[in-house]
Amino acid sequence: MASIVAVSAREILDSRGNPTVEVDVVLETGAAGRAAVPSGASTGEREAVELRDGDPARYGGKGVLNAVNNVNTEIAEALEDMDATDQIAVDRALLDLDGTENKGRLGANAMLGVSMAVARAAAFEVGLPLYRYLGGPMARTLPVPMMNILNGGAHATNTVDFQEFMIIPVGADSFADGLRMGTQVFHQLKKVLVSRKLSTGVGDEGGFAPNLASDEEALKVIIEAIEAAGFRPGQDIALALDVAASELFQNGQYHFKKSGAPSRSPKDMAEMYAGWLEQYPIVSIEDGMSENDWDGWKLLTEKIGDRCQLVGDDLFCTNSEILAKGIENDVANAILIKVNQIGTLTETFEAIELARSAGYNSVISHRSGETEDTFIADLAVATQAGQIKTGAPSRSDRVAKYNQLLRIEEQLEGYAEYPGGAIFGI
């Protein structure tokens, strides 16, 4: 048995310079695993609790020493001598120890760090790559990257309301080819912005963060960059949006405070998206309505759900119970998977399996506050989700995931599959 003999944690910094939790797990054989926990900027109300210290004298109250202490004491004691290869039992022990619905006692950041580090240690123990250990022998589907090359919303201090404008290399033959295509468009976008005397500073996720006249203007400059790179919009490169509409929703209306655009009703929003689908090669819209606007979500799904992937992020929070409600009510048709929204790997896999059984797509995702940890790259292949969001091909915290996927594709040699546009029905 691969018994756990040591569990320890420390406070490290994420890509925004905020503290986060890193965990080490050591087994009796000497096998070890390490994992670092990401953190979001725009967070859903129903996400598991990220435990912060609240001491204004340290990191503006964002320290995580209490979460670290929970790992080093209660959690370490509870997991001693447990079998690291029994992930479900380990995660169940964590859930039982916390004893709350939202993981507010121990902290989802403490629990997730342990859950991921245990999986890494177990993979090392049995001599398998992490993606193979988690996914089994059939794990060979590389994800199509959704590359956030223009940032707005809570991820940037500009005049763009929508949080992410992404490009998707649907016409690529492999992950490596898709990454190349997306990167070439990213560099062309910089040239387009320079030609317009716009800022080429980047946001939290590595995408450019210029001040633009409107959210639609972002689509136009990206189309220009795609064509300048020698690609065909819609055939080679498609578009995706993360509206993060919960950040815009107040008193039944969507307010565009950054750009100063007129407020819109849920019906207006749905009609706007439908119009954009006619004008631009958009194949995916994430959080197009607020997490608290289920009627708006229903309207949106009925209006464009047959021809566009509609992803619930804040809506579902990687939570199987909330996802089940969405499935029952025919709301959205895909779920964003963020491991720190739910707090354990077991619950993450449960959400993915529920989505798959209902015909919903899953998109594995980073957070805006990331680390150099590449766990989600392996997770994307292990679950055969077929899609990943991990930012622009810029900033080491984002590129680390892309580079890990390149390594995995190389390891799989001729067995790797890249779904391309097929995952969107194109």
Curated annotation (Swiss-Prot):
Belongs to the enolase family. Keywords: Cytoplasm, Glycolysis, Lyase, Magnesium, Metal-binding, Secreted. Gene3D superfamilies: Enolase-like C-terminal domain, Enolase-like, N-terminal domain. Its EC number is 4.2.1.11. Its main location: cytoplasm. GO terms for biological process: glycolytic process. One of its GO terms (molecular function) is magnesium ion binding. CDD domains: enolase. This is Enolase. It is found in: Cytoplasm; Secreted; Cell surface. Binds a second Mg(2+) ion via substrate during catalysis. Signal peptide: none annotated. It catalyses: (2R)-2-phosphoglycerate = phosphoenolpyruvate + H2O. (2R)-2-phosphoglycerate binds at residues 163, 338, 367-368, 389. It comes from the Bacteria. One of its GO terms (cellular component) is extracellular region. The lineage of its organism: Bacteria, Pseudomonadati, Gemmatimonadota, Gemmatimonadia, Gemmatimonadales. It is an enzyme of class 4 (lyase).
